[in-house]
């Protein structure tokens, strides 16, 4: 049986710890529980998570707690980012007018063979090559 990989963007992981967004926190928890066997992340996602929760929260997470969270997330499949991925992201950012960082997420998801990208940073329902963009926080879905 093959796995349909689903790529999870940084914002989904951040909401797991965001006390100021309880509804999104619950949705993120439900998503990770439901999809736990087919989740793929990237090195970029792990790094962005660490920086966001330790520097950008109203009440920053301790460095130790953030490091433990990154360690826990590392148990999911983690897609490496290779020079080819970076070059593809540069090209995509120019051709689709996406930010480089969003393009790198897209390219990592495609490289991982993911069919779905869970994010709130791109347009819900959009298809990018073989990748379906899904905003898990969108109302009515």
State the predicted function of each range.
Residues 1-41, 56-64, 140:
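Short, well-structured N-terminal submotif of metal-dependent ribonuclease cores
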Residues 1-5, 106-141:
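Acidic, PIN/NYN-like endoribonuclease modules and their adjacent C-terminal/linker elements
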Residues 9-11, 48, 102, 121:
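Acidic active-site catalytic centers that drive phospho-/nucleotidyl reactions
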Residues 40-44, 119:
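Substrate-recognition element of Asp-dependent hydrolases with the DxDx(T/V) motif
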Residues 50-76:
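Active-site-proximal, substrate-binding regions of enzyme catalytic domains
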Residues 66-70, 76-87, 95, 122-141:
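Short acidic, glycine/proline-enriched helix-loop-strand junctions
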Residues 75-120:
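Active-site neighborhoods of divalent-metal-dependent phosphate/nucleic-acid chemistry enzymes
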């Amino acid at each position: 049986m093959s796995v349909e990989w689903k790529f999870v963007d940084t914002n989904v992981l951040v909401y797991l710890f965001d006390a100021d967004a309880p509804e999104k926190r619950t949705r993120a928890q439900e998503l990770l529980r439901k999809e736990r066997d087919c989740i793929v992340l990237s090195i970029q996602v792990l790094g962005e998570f660490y920086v966001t929760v330790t520097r950008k929260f109203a009440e920053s997470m301790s460095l130790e707690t953030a490091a433990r969270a990154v360690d826990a997330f590392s148990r999911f499949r983690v897609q490496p980012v290779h020079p080819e991925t970076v070059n593809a992201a540069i090209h995509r950012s120019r051709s689709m007018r996406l930010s480089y960082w969003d393009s790198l997420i897209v390219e990592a998801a495609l490289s991982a063979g993911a069919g779905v990208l869970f994010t709130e940073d791109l347009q819900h329902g959009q298809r990018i090559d073989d990748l379906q963009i899904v905003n898990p926080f969108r109302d009515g879905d």
